[in-house]
Every structure is written in C-alpha cells, then in structure tokens.
C-alpha cells in the first residue's frame, strides 16, 4: 500500500497494472514562504504562476527539493505554467527532504514551496521566513492511497482493509483531527473537503 500526493503518477501506476483501488483520503495545500520583506513581491501575486515569475524576475533566491517527489513535480508544473525554466545561481537545489530544504531556505533567506502540514509542524526551523502566498487552486495537494492488484503480494488484502478503514468515517475523523491537539490546527483536510479539488 502506498499513500501518495502525485495524482498523475497514481493514474499511471494503475494504467501500468501494478497498482489498484485509487482512494482519495485527504488533502493539504502548498504555500510559498520567504523573507517577510518579500523582495520579489510575491504577496501581491494573483496566482502561483505569477508568484513564480516574480521570483525568477527578481533573481530569487528559490530553494527546490529537486528530488522528483510529489512536491517537486508540483513545483515544476508551476514553473512550466509560469513560462520559466528555473536555472542559474538563484535556483538552489537541495536533493533533500522537506524539513532540511526548509532549513536551507531559511539560511539562504530564500523563497520555498512548503506543504502546509510541514509548515505547521516545522516552521520553528525557519524563523526568518513567513507565508507570503497561498490559496491558488493549483496549490491544493490531494492524497490518494493505492494497493497492489489482487493476488500480487501476501499482505495485499490487509493493506486493502487498511485503506477501507482510512476512507471510513472513523478514519476520516482521525485525518481531519490529526495534529489539532498539539499544533492548534489540523494538519490535513478530509476526503470530503479534498473531493472538490480531485
């Protein structure tokens, strides 16, 4: 079983025959963070693509995970929509995970696209950054669960039952409430909310 936030890759895995049972389980969103002074002026952008164009025009800096993760794929989708080929000294590639990349963005006083869950949990590692842009529909980050096709692995049926639980009312309540007690807000939206973006 895999829980993933790259819908096109999920569809490809199913089409290629090595995954089944695509099940929407929830969402969060991406947000663009950067120095409060916002030298590129992305806070005034009307879309994520416009915000990215502003970063490129200002010469960044912009930190990218550059790791072909779902986050990196979304970032590259936005650069393409912006008509920008990100390259040069202003474009810093970490090849690292989200928290390490967020720390690097803080050290560089750079712009960075974080998922909202990581930001809520880890913003303490980036005290010099703040959320500057969010809310574009393209930044919604949906999560799906998939499982191996029937008979593919010994644990496949157990994995399918777990997906059914996660999609059940009780599983969805857990997702919607996850993190609320510790951080003061939930880290994810449930599938009912996410469905409008799927």
Task: Kindly give the residue locations of the regions a language model identified.
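Hydrophobic/aromatic-rich structural module bridging two neighboring secondary-structure elements via a short loop
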Residues: 13-21
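Exported/periplasmic ABC-transporter solute-binding proteins
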Residues: 6-7, 12-14, 26, 35, ...
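Short, glycine-/small- and polar/acidic-enriched structural segments
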Residues: 1, 21-33
């Amino acid at each position: 079983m895999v829980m993933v936030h790259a819908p096109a890759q999920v569809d490809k895995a199913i089409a290629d025959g090595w995954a089944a049972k695509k099940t929407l389980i929830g969402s969060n969103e991406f947000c663009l963070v950067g120095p409060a002074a916002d030298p590129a002026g992305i806070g005034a952008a009307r879309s994520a693509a416009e915000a990215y164009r502003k970063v490129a025009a200002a010469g960044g800096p912009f930190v990218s995970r550059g790791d072909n993760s779902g986050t990196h794929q979304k970032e590259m989708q936005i650069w393409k929509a912006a008509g920008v080929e990100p390259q040069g000294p202003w474009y810093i590639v970490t090849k690292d995970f989200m928290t390490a990349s967020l720390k690097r963005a803080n050290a560089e006083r750079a712009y960075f696209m974080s998922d909202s869950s990581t930001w809520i949990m880890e913003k303490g590692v980036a005290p010099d950054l703040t959320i500057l842009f969010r809310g574009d529909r393209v930044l919604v980050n949906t999560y799906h669960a998939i499982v191996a096709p029937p008979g593919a692995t010994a644990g496949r049926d157990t994995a399918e039952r777990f997906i059914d639980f996660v999609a059940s009312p009780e599983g969805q309540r857990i997702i919607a409430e996850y993190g609320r007690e510790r951080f003061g807000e939930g880290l994810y939206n449930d599938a009912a909310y996410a469905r409008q973006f799927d």
